[in-house]
Regions:
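N-terminal Rossmann-like NAD(P) cofactor-binding subdomain of oxidoreductases
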Residues: 1-202, 231-233, 262, 266, ...
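C-terminal substrate-binding/catalytic lobe of Rossmann-fold NAD(P)-dependent dehydrogenases
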Residues: 202-288
Length: 288
């Protein structure tokens, strides 16, 4: 598959570029970004801002950056795009829908469409079946092939998978406290020196996302939309900490009836999903 990264010069875009460099299924054919980067080689556009631990892949250095707003041009060169633009939410929604309407599927790292009822928010091991809602989304957008799918808030990925296998044991409440690295804000210590030896006890919007997004992931499709689950009740507190990469979560879970320790361990050990069944390239053999 020929793929593109829209928003390729930012920190998340760089991560996509790094992950795609040696991917066995996907060939990085297009890097796109803002007009100020367009026309430059990727190496020129990113320069000293390359923030990944591995060197910039050789095959991308001399690729010419396209203008992300030139949707038809980008879409004509790829089978689908990964989107990691840094823009206002309204602008992101419009841009992603433009790509979808150009019959170019969009896999988005952004939060702009996470609350859109017919846009699936996927953790593949948990709710791969939610891709069925794409049929309704295509009807709304008037597309045959184009669609938008999104990933959830990055901090949720650390603990929602651990809670999911326990839902059948009667989880009623979740109390989560996340300690989130500065990479989640698209920053490094070089670009955010104020975070050295510092903590920010509140991250605007993160608590709301952390309380709502898991319920959409655990929801079901009804009348062409994803209806969020009503349980469990989730309360979250999100703190920015002086760590470069990697989020930490401390989570307390309440059950209707306390399960045995052995039942919890068994649920974790036996849980897997479609990525494990299909042996996908980046899927861990054991999910938890």
């Amino acid at each position: 598959y020929q793929v593109g990264v829209v928003g390729a010069t930012g920190m998340v875009g760089q991560r996509f570029v790094s992950l795609l460099a040696q991917h066995p299924w996907f060939h990085l054919a297009v890097v796109a970004a803002s007009p100020r980067s367009a026309g430059k080689t990727y190496e020129e556009a990113v320069g000293s801002r390359w923030a990944m631990p591995d060197p910039m892949p050789e095959q991308v250095k001399n690729m010419v950056v396209l203008d992300a707003s030139h949707v038809e041009e980008v879409a004509s060169k790829v089978d689908f795009v990964f989107c990691a633009v840094d823009m206002k939410k309204e602008e992101i929604r419009a841009l992603e829908e433009s790509y979808a309407k150009a019959e170019c599927p969009v896999v988005s790292n952004n939060s702009a469409h996470r609350s859109t009822p017919d846009v699936p928010m996927i953790i593949p091991e948990i709710n791969a079946d939610h891709v069925a809602v794409i049929e309704a989304q295509r009807k709304r957008l008037g597309t045959k092939r184009g669609f938008i799918a999104v990933k959830c808030n990055c901090s949720l990925q650390s603990y929602v998978p651990a809670i999911h296998p326990l839902l059948d044991l009667g989880v009623t409440k979740v109390l989560a406290c996340t300690y989130q690295a500065i990479s989640g804000a698209g920053k490094t210590f070089a670009t955010w020196p104020e975070m050295v030896d510092n903590c920010i006890p509140y991250i605007g919007g993160e608590e709301e996302k952390s309380e709502k997004e898991p319920l959409k992931i655990w929801g079901h499709i009804e009348n062409g939309a994803i209806v969020s689950a009503e349980q469990p009740t989730i309360s979250a507190q999100c703190i920015r900490v002086p760590v470069s990469d990697g989020h930490l979560a401390t989570v307390a879970v309440k059950f209707a009836n306390k399960p045995a320790r052995e039942d919890i361990l068994k649920a974790w050990a036996s849980f897997g999903g479609e990525p494990q069944k299909l042996a996908l390239p980046h899927a861990p053999e054991r999910f938890i």
